[in-house]
């Protein structure tokens, strides 16, 4: 059913979709402050793999309806990838960029355990038929464009983008590819990712505070993943809690994920107390330990066999490792077509001129510009590739062991 707001909305007052999408870009001065601080006592890598959560980047446009050019979505997403790739290149760090999109986030592997998972935002997308259809029409164009954008790839799936990224990251590591990873998102679910991967940084995109233009986006690492998640859902400053940061899935099972429509079984203080008690007795937080310790500490909750089943299902729905296991049983997990690329700068320029004249792809940032002083002309060359598409395909198709 189409949302009545579409009919009632005053298009003259609507915000153009491209304005919403470009607001998802974190400015270079903010990025510079964040990463200068992060690398002040660490060696700066020569390569980084960047994963961008396109689902979360597109989600805000489903509250708006003004469309000036249907191709602006593709242009903005392409420029989002170039924006971050260019930032790191200026710092002497080259990169792969993986644009990850899941229009039915959680439907394949999570709603079987928790039917309500992400229901609110799924309905928001479906009810805005105009934007929903326009996004779907842009997907083939984005896929085609990325075939010509060197080292920028677009992968579509049906699971959480965090699961897609986790799959690729672990396959890289299993093949001894040790480049650090950056995951850019505004997903609460994604806080698990840095808790699981030692050298992964999550760049959490925040909306500016009301009445300000201040960008409060921040970095999340293995050392502060759980602390940062608690601060995010409680809308408070980050505190240090003496709990294993990698047990975030256990905490989420108990306290819920607000932006994924999973309500709390325990408040955050009770959830922390349960995890601390488990930490004193066990090596890991499992559904059994969560249930048993919860019963012991909070008998007034009246937990029963139904509660146990609920905790088991919530854990399977949430836990990143379990979701990775589920994902790897699906055909989409071994798809490598998205890695196929064509070295044809002239074709890319023609595509840009044909489809994106009003909102062009920033090719000058994508390509290096080498000045040949003897001939007085600019020579456009593609960046250095540290792995071929065939090698990448072999890695991402490889086994999980």
Stretches with model-predicted labels:
Residues 59, 128-341, 345, 385-388:
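Nuclease catalytic cores that cleave nucleic-acid phosphodiester bonds
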Residues 4, 8-179, 195-210, 319, ...:
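Noncatalytic, basic helical substrate-engagement surface that gates or grips nucleic-acid strands
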